[in-house]
Every structure is written in structure tokens, then in C-alpha cells.
């Protein structure tokens, strides 16, 4: 049996999605939940040294990180571990997690299952019109508050 994917998937897999700023990092929505009938969404994060989101919990989805370039330290529950290119880790729903970029730059693909949380990223982002490497200003409190509608709860500061 073969599965025919709708055109948005084909378009997304060609990298046609425009990057945007979110919490100081560059993000691209590669595959939306709409393209997978809600099964998964895939985003690409490109960050610089020290970039770290607050420690947080997702109520609704598991998060799978796949490091493409660079070195990233992940915190998942009580575990702390370093990943490099080609390595993968899981942040299960309901478990506090975060990361911090250790190398000069890092890039990772993040899969959310099921999808839905990608809308939080998109609706709370800033356009990346001219990429001079300077992130657009952002309001952390507003982004954190908006996350509650998507089942994302901040439970601590970013890791150091």
C-alpha cells in the first residue's frame, strides 16, 4: 500500500518554509501538522552559543531532538547529557526539559508528536526579513503566557 501525501508535505520537504525568530533563535517550520493530519510536525532550530529556552513541560506532545550540527546539552527530567551531530534524544510529554547550545552554532531538527504546538511557535514569532544575525526583540512573558493555550508550562530558568 502506498500513501499519497498532500502537496503541502512535498512543498515543505523542499525547504520552502521561511525562517523566523523565536525566543532569540532562528526557526523554520518544515512540516506542519496540517500536512500530516495531526500526526507530527517538524521544525528546524538554528541557535548560537548559550541559546537556551526556559525549563518547560509539554502536556500534549512528545519532543524528539535530532542534532544536525554543533554540540547541545539537554536536560530531561533529572538527566543531563550532551549530544552532537547524528545523535537523537526524546523529551516525553509531562517531563520537564530544556537545552543549551555549547558550540558556536548548532542546528537541530525537532519533531513534535502529535502536532499542534508548532502554531505556538509561528504565532509568537518575529519575521526574519534581513538575516544580519541579530535576533528580533521578543517579550518572554507574553510568549510564556501564550504557551499555556498549547499546554506548554515554564517550570524553571534556562540551563546554564
Where are the regions that the model predicts?
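Well-ordered beta-strand scaffold positions
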Residues: 25, 79-81, 104
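Hydrophobic small-molecule pocket/channel-lining residues, especially in calycin-type beta-barrels
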Residues: 51, 59, 72, 122, ...
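A short, N-terminal "cap"/entry segment at the start of jelly-roll beta-barrel domains
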Residues: 1-40, 133-160
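A contiguous, mid-protein "functional segment" used to position or interact
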Residues: 104-148
